[in-house]
């Protein structure tokens, strides 16, 4: 897959998580809530500040992040794979191992 986000945008591949009900039944597909964790697969060059300089992003390719799956997040299918395009400001945290 070859995609290059612009400015402060990032491309995230959602990480699917196994979800169990209170009774121990594994929920999959539409019965399970979508994960708000993902892996950064591409990053833009950075945010353009008012003075014209570019501020690099805090996230990098390979980071596992927790994101806000809200209004500004765009879902797109590229090479038969679903990815999310979002601004860095939609990322809430970087998961550190």
Swiss-Prot record:
Keywords: Chaperone, Cytoplasm
UniProt cross-references to SMART domains, sorted A to Z: Cpn10
Keyword Transferase: no
UniProt record, GO biological process: chaperone cofactor-dependent protein refolding
One GO MF term: unfolded protein binding
Gene Ontology cellular component terms for the protein in this record: cytoplasm
Lineage top rank: taxon: Bacteria
Family recorded in the similarity comment: Belongs to the GroES chaperonin family.
HAMAP family named in the record: CH10
Task of the protein: Together with the chaperonin GroEL, plays an essential role in assisting protein folding. The GroEL-GroES system forms a nano-cage that allows encapsulation of the non-native substrate proteins and provides a physical environment optimized to promote and accelerate protein folding. GroES binds to the apical surface of the GroEL ring, thereby capping the opening of the GroEL channel.
Xref: NCBIfam families: PRK00364.1-1, PRK00364.1-2, PRK00364.2-2
Subunit relationships: Heptamer of 7 subunits arranged in a ring. Interacts with the chaperonin GroEL.
Record protein name field: Co-chaperonin GroES
Native organism: Klebsiella pneumoniae (strain 342)
């Amino acid at each position: 897959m070859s995609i290059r986000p612009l400015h402060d945008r990032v491309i995230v591949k959602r990480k699917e998580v196994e979800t169990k009900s209170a009774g121990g039944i594994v929920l999959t597909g539409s019965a399970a809530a979508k994960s708000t964790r993902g892996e950064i697969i591409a990053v833009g060059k950075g945010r353009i500040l008012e003075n014209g300089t570019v501020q690099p992003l805090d996230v990098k390719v390979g980071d596992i992040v927790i994101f806000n799956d809200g209004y500004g997040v765009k879902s797109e299918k590229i090479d038969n794979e679903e990815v999310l395009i979002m601004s860095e400001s939609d990322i809430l945290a970087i998961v550190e191992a």
